[in-house]
Design a protein with these regions (language model features):
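Short, solvent-exposed loop/turn elements at domain surfaces
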Residues: 82-88, 105-108
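Alpha-helical cap/lid subdomain in secreted, periplasmic
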Residues: 89-95, 110-260
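Acidic/histidine-rich helix-loop elements
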Residues: 39-51, 93-107, 135-141, 232
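Conserved beta-strand elements of the Class I
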Residues: 75-77, 97
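Short hydrophobic segments within beta-strands
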Residues: 77-78, 167
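Active-site metal-binding loops of divalent metal-dependent hydrolases
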Residues: 80, 101, 131-132
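N-terminal secretory targeting modules
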Residues: 1-75, 83, 87, 120, ...
Length: 260
């Protein structure tokens, strides 16, 4: 057996130690603006080729059968908070369909609303959006622009005899290192203002209901309760356990109100 010269072994040891040292270096922390820029760059091709990401559920929609007679089909429609919600675990046996796409804003949702909601013929659509608009995921958004998109979603749904549930925007927190950018990009004041508008809108529009997640998930500082999300935005299992019965109650309310 040929032994490796001592100097070669020594050199390789130094190289390996160097790589180990580099691997252990802390990842540079991005500012909120840098994180947002990085997100936009990562989505640039997708947003250019299919801004609404209509292709995401194309095959699933094509395979979906029409609702059975008497079926109370519900579409949960929104961004990542909906996308990562395992509906079958929280609503077993219910004809509930998930059409969330992570990172989306209301202008993107408008583009895919026909394919992912109208054409599926639900009785109810549960819309949870707004947080990424406030963050500026697809560009700066004024509150009045977000509100106009919400109104358009509701009008399209009601024109197709679909009941609308507007979910409140969830609070955010800054209690963990992972949450700092999420919080900095999402003004609590804007979240409150948008929720106030949503509540006022449904009060004057028949066929629309307000689903208040916010009040059940906010702490005494006006932030998302620490134990409901690690990154300050996306609910964990404890968060979804709070949300599920609230959603179920709102769906029951919508269906009951629609009965002749």
């Amino acid at each position: 057996m040929t032994l490796m010269p001592f100097r070669v072994v020594q050199y390789l040891s130094v190289v390996l130690l160097s790589f180990t040292s580099l691997a252990q270096q802390p990842t540079p922390t991005l500012t909120p603006d840098q994180a947002l820029r990085q997100y936009r760059e990562s989505k640039a091709t997708t947003l250019r080729d299919d801004f609404g990401e209509r292709g995401r559920y194309r095959d699933a929609n094509a395979a979906l059968k029409p609702p059975a007679p008497g079926e109370n089909r519900v579409v949960f429609f929104g961004d990542s908070i909906t996308d990562i919600w395992h509906l079958d675990e929280y609503f077993p046996g219910k004809p509930y369909i998930n059409r969330g796409i992570g990172g989306q804003t209301t202008p993107q949702m408008l583009i895919r609303f026909r394919q992912d909601v109208i054409d599926l013929h639900p009785k109810v659509v549960v819309i949870l959006a707004g947080t990424n608009d406030i963050a500026g995921n697809t560009g700066p958004m004024r509150l009045e622009d977000i509100e106009a998109n919400y109104a358009s979603l509701a009008e399209i749904a009601r024109a197709n005899h679909i009941l609308v549930i507007f979910s409140s925007v969830l609070p955010v927190h800054n209690y963990t290192p992972r949450s700092l950018n999420m919080y900095a990009q999402r003004s609590p004041e804007k979240i409150l203002a948008l929720n106030h508008w949503l509540k006022d809108y449904v009060a004057t529009h028949p066929g629309c209901i307000y689903l208040d997640y916010f009040s059940a998930m906010v702490d005494d500082k006006g932030l998302l309760k620490r134990d409901l999300a690690e990154d300050g935005l996306h609910p964990n299992a404890a968060g979804y356990k709070i949300m599920a019965p609230l959603a179920e109650a709102a769906i029951a309310q919508a269906l009951a109100a629609a009965k002749p």
